[in-house]
Amino acid sequence: MSARLDDGVRPGEIVLEHASRAFSVRADRGRSLKELLIGRARAGGPPPVEALKDVSLRIEPGETVGIVGRNGAGKSSTLRVLSGIVPLNSGRVACGGQVVAQLELGAGFGRDFSGRENIFLNGALHGLVKEQIEERMAAIVEFSELDDFIDAPVATYSSGMFLRLGFAIAAHLDADVLLIDEVLAVGDEAFQRKCEARIAEQIAAGATLVLVSHDAALIERTCRRVVVLDGGRKIFDGPVGEGMPFYHRLMGTPEEVAAP
């Protein structure tokens, strides 16, 4: 997915100010209408879950930032807020320039369409005209390694093929800001290295990167800054060389075990 949330910031700049976001919890499945009405009248329903609590970040153009934390710490919620998928309850978010979010690869695919047709569809959704998509078609197909299957319906693809096509499309979009959430475990080890190399090319071209991953080694070799979230709050923001030891202590993970 790509989006534009400029709001007066420079291309590649990200601003998050006092951001808070809560989600309602629905534990209503399997209950009758009467039980729902009585339960809500008595208890008012479960309280909302606070995914982000007064989080502020400023990321300069070209920075590479990793976001780490326990499950449920607010990492994915942060990327969804930055991408414009999820609105804030309070606070401000602004991302300058073209934002490319790799959160759920292939989420917008038409399963009855071929891989090639989905490239055209997704390219158009990201603002590319037909001529621009055609110019990138060969590179996308080559990167995906789906040459023999590109004209088959994606419904016939394996999960790995599906994800490879999704990454290949996203990797060939013009990006001022890259938002990546746990999507680099795509395909075999050789393909993963190719994905990392492509991201490195985009960073070298000036793109800002915000990466969410449980892979500590990936964060350390890709990012220069790390943000640690816990319970929806920012508890560390600084150089990766200081942040990852802090994260390992938080998780109770010895650094020598976390390293590959």
Which residues are covered by each model-predicted region?
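Conserved ABC ATPase "signature" region
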Residues: 33-41, 120, 132-149, 166-168
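A short, surface-exposed alpha-helical micro-motif characterized by mixed small hydrophobic
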Residues: 219-221
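The feature captures the beta-strand-to-loop junction immediately N-terminal to the Walker
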Residues: 68-70
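H-loop/switch region of ABC-family ATPase nucleotide-binding domains
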Residues: 213-214
